[in-house]
Amino acid sequence: MPHHILCAVYGLMPSISVVTCRVLGMLNWKNYGSDFDTKYWLVKDACGLFTCSITNFFIFGGAYVTNVYGLKEKSTMNMIHSVIVCTLLFLGAISQWQCMLTDPGAVPLDAVPLKAAAATSNTCNRCGTFKPSRAHHDRVSKRCVVKMDHFCPWVNNCVGFYNHKFFILFLVYVFLGS
């Protein structure tokens, strides 16, 4: 059933209705993308989504191997090691998802330069929007990104101004957990 019908059905209980509508709205694939009119950020690149899935497989596979084979000998040190590694890998997976689902700093369609910088304003040749200084066009998401570092296929997103922290945390947690 479409989520607006469920919202009408649960109209008598507003708190359940709001939660149900939000969850079902978030599960709708049409709400995700890197276009100007999407509600939630997600780069819909098949290769990137596959690579991101492989990354999750290795993270959770590492946690599984640590728990199954690391705890064959029952000792306190093995238990502590397993808890630390699984915690770090879980935090790495959370950081990966935050990096993947966070807008990296894409320039909005209606962005205009400041009055002081209007004389030297640039326009992107590929997407036609205002291009601030230190912004670069990302070929995969087809958007200009402020302080773009690179496109990372392991998180299926461009690393930019708003998700740089999550990317560094992802690297640190996976490095320490491996």
Feature map (PLM): residue ranges:
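Intracellular leaflet-associated regions of eukaryotic membrane-associated proteins
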Residues: 1-178
